[in-house]
Amino acid sequence: MPLHRGLAAGVLTLLTIASVIVAQAPAAAQENNDPEAVGSVGIRLLEAPVSLQDDPRAMAYIVDNLPPGTTITRRIEVSNGSDREQTITLYPAAASIGEGADGFQIGDGRAVNELTTWMSVAPTDVVLPPNTAEEAVVTIAVPEDAPEGEQYAVVWAQTADAPTETGIQNVSRVGIRTY
């Protein structure tokens, strides 16, 4: 009996080690070893309404209660903190409030909702040299016939490398919540 227990323990140990190696293999196969990989993109709000100066969210997020027929603009800054030139795409996308830690849920990709149809970002694409930043403007034009109520979105700054021969594409997005 003791021989079988020792053999079983040895086999179990080998199986555990093998499963750890196999479980990590797919991640290692997809690892990007490019030191200048996509990333290091930043975005921040540069201004907030005077009426919201005491609201701590107002300098981090676009926070406004806009009546129908109102148009606002907010200046933002997008930055490239990498060591190479990057093309950064700016666009709004849908979000919602739901269950979870903070409740703010972002839609897939360039998902559209009512608020995103009222939003624009100019410029939509910026080419930034290494370690530089550029301003952009977010405009929200609420139509006259818009329903009252809260709307949610995010303004994205995104970079993307071309897909590899295996179809893998690195995408980096950072955003500003819009309430």
Where on the chain are the PLM-derived regions?
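Surface-exposed binding patches on compact interaction domains or structured appendages
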Residues: 31-61, 83-135
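Short secondary-structure capping/turn segments at boundaries of alpha-helices and beta-strands
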Residues: 60-63, 73-77
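Short Pro-Gly-centered flexible turn/kink motifs
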Residues: 69-75, 127-139
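Asparagine-centered strand-capping/turn motif at beta-strand->loop junctions
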Residues: 78-82
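Terminal connector regions
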Residues: 84-111, 135, 141-179
